[in-house]
Amino acid sequence: MEKQWWHGKIAYQIYPKSFFDTNGDGIGDLPGIIEKLDYLKDLGVDIVWLSPVYRSPLADQGYDISDYYDIDPRFGTMDDIDRLLAEAKKRDMYIVMDLVVNHCSDEHEWFKKACADPEGKYGQYFYLRKLRKAAELKTGTNSEAAGEVSESEKDGAAGDVKESEKDGAAGESFGTALTAAVENRTADGGEAFAVCSPDGYVLPCNWRSYFGGPVWEKLPGHEDWFYLHVFHKKQPDLNWENPGVREEIYTMINWWLDRGLAGFRIDAIINIKKALPFHNYAPDRADGLCTIGRMLQEASGVGEFLGEMRDRTFKPHQAFTVGEVFNEKAEELPAFIGDNGYFSSMFDFSETVWGNSHAGWHKNKSIMPDDYRQCLFDTQKKVSDIGFISNIIENHDEPRGVSRYIPPQDMQSMDEQMRVTAKKALATVYFFVKGLPWIYQGQEIGMENYPLQSIDEVDDIASLDAWNVMLRQGVSEEDALRAIERNGRDNARTPFQWSAAANAGFTAGSPWLQVNPNYTKINLEQQAADPSSVFCYYKKLIALRKNPQYCQTLIYGSFDPYLEDRSRVISYLRRSSGQTILVLSNYGKETRILPLPAPVKKILLDNCEGNDLSVTNSTVTLSGYRTLVLEL
């Protein structure tokens, strides 16, 4: 593995809408990010990823882009983004933006032109099909029902990398009105069937969108034309089989990199390659549909697109890129993040998808400490020296890490001091595994999930669909609400808690999403003044990883699990020539005596600093959630 400039850096994700509002409209903005750059610099952050700020109707919070070359006025202007890039450069910081190119907005000019002329140039920018009604068909296949496919799609097939099903969604396309309608339709290893729209059109395939319902929606202004959307119906998929689409995308990427952007986080990128021609799979719910993940399991060939994109855009600019890739196979890692990989890095989602169920959020299993450890260690063993993984405990699509990876029963039964200790323990065990550590806004102060009182408080479209799915399956409203409270994306999107002032100091107006009521107890202003706080501990984590005496071991040293057979112990060794560092966490409430692999030379970090510590040459006694970083 070649050493890269970013290996020793600290990365931070900003969800702009919820970070800091400067104009009182209740929405975070680019001037707010500029104002807080010194805060991020003081924390120790080097790389800042902004979730989308492009012009957008915000149907999916900016992941539906209507103009890739402009900033949405709710966030600011192009002058603001240029000023942000300039101010970041002054501080030796790097700005990374979201790259969302599996789909665009249905309000993008390309899609409007496709609607005006489905058989014209821009109709080929998307997956459009002229369909026939079931009543018109007596024999044939779904492909025949769908009409002719374009030449560019005939040889298509999506990537070997499987993206995990993200349960939940809006259910706004065809709802439950789907019916198994026409005989002699091919299915995946099962009985032949087809699914139809409510008005009887036979759909080309029975894939379920990430946001619920079928992936096919009627093209505006047309009776028998439909378009594909694997996410929300306002996010039509771009046809990557069309070289003209790829050229448009590469031109846009290079335009941003030439403007001074350091790189991109690449959104949902495995979805760009579809399994073509369209066909059904065995349904996995009563709606007659199957998860998109099933299609991605079968698909192959995405690497051709990713390699071309790398060579045409990222590589000439030496850009930093991190991919959103789910459930990749070990043999694919060199192609993705090796020395000439498609991306600089990619996120480890193994723990975020653990226990997820296709049946609905109420069926998701809670991840326990030993499960979390297994996910963490399996990824480290799999990646090894192939490349540099990006490590997270939360992001804008996930619940808060401290509410997920610290057992809820522990959080509820512990006093405030021990909860702080547990939050520091979680921070430590993920921070020093091999790879690039990412901090999501609010994580550094231990922000927690929002305590839902009503479904009316929920904004997230995935959560709202999950609610409908659960109620249709007979789940009580109370149980459904608790499932959303555990799994919903709004948990990460509540405004940053800057202070105990009104609206947590986020805005002088009315916040677009409610502030977590615990902001009077959990906020930056209080923690910055408290040396024992979660925030001050994160500063210590960052300082240790950057310490010249230890950074080579913590960045490039080998990773060796320790005490893997001990339940509720998360421990590992980082080794380099002449130096060994042990991370040792008693990840439970009870005091334990744990063996040491060698005598301790120095305590580098202690999440209970100031408390007595019993250490011998061969053992250490750790109280509940006490966690140490030791030089041996």
Predicted regions and their residues:
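Active-site and adjacent substrate-binding regions of carbohydrate-active enzymes
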Residues: 1-155, 159-632
